[in-house]
Amino acid sequence: MVKIRLTRGGAKKRPFYQIIVTDSRNKRDGRNIERVGHYNPVAQGAESRVVLNMARVEHWVRNGAQLTDKVRSLLKEVSKTQATAA
């Protein structure tokens, strides 16, 4: 099964996550199929907290990819900010 989930990067006490498409059997920080965005939970000021390539996410979801709970909530956050910006 293909999943869209987070993989951790960054330094100790300063997490940074890539939003990736991967097979569910792969390790958390293992091999991935495609990187579709990133998430910075400690973003401050003008830094962007979540960046997603919505076209690619929609493509993978149409082709059967499952979203993890955290990625689903980030997707809602991005769509909400895009709606208020438009």
From Swiss-Prot:
One of its GO terms (molecular function) is structural constituent of ribosome. Keywords: Ribonucleoprotein, Ribosomal protein. SUPFAM superfamilies: Ribosomal protein S16. It comes from the Bacteria. GO terms for biological process: translation. Pfam families: Ribosomal_S16. GO terms for cellular component: cytoplasm; small ribosomal subunit. InterPro entries: Ribosomal_bS16 (IPR000307), Ribosomal_bS16_CS (IPR020592), Ribosomal_bS16_dom_sf (IPR023803). Belongs to the bacterial ribosomal protein bS16 family. This is Small ribosomal subunit protein bS16. The lineage of its organism: Bacteria, Pseudomonadati, Pseudomonadota, Gammaproteobacteria, Lysobacterales.
